[in-house]
Design a protein with these regions (language model features):
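Active-site-adjacent structural elements that line small-molecule/cofactor binding pockets in enzymes
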Residues: 1-283
């Protein structure tokens, strides 16, 4: 099992320099991944928000080995050919450390409808699926054309290719019990299940994860490694208590634990303290 940080880059975490320093502290403290939110406006008005690609670029320069990426990239409000350029550039800058977390993006009303973007989940899902096909085609470094219901691309060759082979890993987010996101996730490299409890904090239980894993396994035709990402909070200075929490998720099939580091969890100093204590360990 691997351990990373999932940080909300808004409110007191809006400065790319600060975010990159936190990522550096995570790396030297033993965490293996550092993932940032992708929010355009969010659910609160007049809150400072950082652009994820600027933050990730700063992180890539500041760190050496920690995996990085958006968690999750709201692909339906992006042009996939522009995203192809951005992701390859970041993969090169980070020397092959990028993981692309993808999903519909939320909240739909504030991050989409407010700015004249399509808020409907089904239509955004169609856009996401076509965008993923385009990304992989443009990452190939070979002549690629596309004729979808939404996007049309004349034959084009994008160079350079990503550092990673065969391509940049793709993790797909989905809110359980909706089934379409998990059908989508089974086609790619990992799943990031979300279970909304209504309080804006992680609510996925090991029991729910077991049910999700059965669903994923029934759909997954591809071989090879498949990541299962869960997030939550482990207590400070309590290795035994932390192990009790993550052991249950590991037994249910999780391959990554992401520590939830958001302003709602505590002050900057409190959250930095938890990061510097390092990741939890399995029993």
């Amino acid at each position: 099992m691997k351990f990373g940080i999932h940080i909300g880059i808004s409110q007191s975490y809006f400065d790319p320099k600060l975010i990159s320093e936190i990522a550096y502290q995570a790396e030297i403290s033993g965490w293996e991944g550092f993932f940032v939110t992708d929010s355009l406006y969010g659910s609160h008005e007049s809150v400072p928000v950082c652009d994820p690609w600027v933050a990730l670029s700063a992180i890539a320069v500041k760190t050496k080995k920690i995996k990085i990426g958006p968690m999750i990239c709201a692909i339906p409000r992006r042009r996939p050919w522009k995203l192809a350029r951005e992701t390859v550039s970041l993969d090169i800058l980070s020397e092959g450390r990028l993981i692309l977390g993808v999903g519909l993006g939320s909240p739909a009303k504030e991050d989409f409808e407010r700015f004249g973007e399509e808020p409907d989940n089904r239509k955004r899902a169609d856009k996401l699926d076509e965008s993923l096909e385009i990304l992989v085609g443009l990452w190939s470094g070979k002549p690629f054309s596309y004729n979808g219901n939404i996007f049309k691309i004349q034959e084009s060759t994008f160079l350079p290719k990503p550092v990673q082979t065969p391509r940049i890993p793709i993790w797909v987010a989905g809110e359980w019990p909706n089934k379409r996101p998990f059908r989508r996730a089974a086609m790619w490299d990992g799943v990031y299940p979300i279970y909304d409890t209504g309080n804006h904090e992680p609510g996925l239980t090991p029991q729910i994860l077991e049910t999700i894993m059965k669903d994923i396994k029934s759909r997954r035709a591809l071989g090879g490694h498949f990541d299962v990402i869960v997030e939550g909070k482990t207590p400070s200075n309590d290795k035994s208590g932390s192990s009790d929490i993550i052991d249950a998720y590991h037994a249910a099939g999780a391959t990554w634990w992401l520590e939830w580091i958001f302003p709602a969890r505590g002050t900057l100093e409190q959250n930095l303290k938890r990061i510097r204590e390092g990741p939890p360990t399995l029993k």
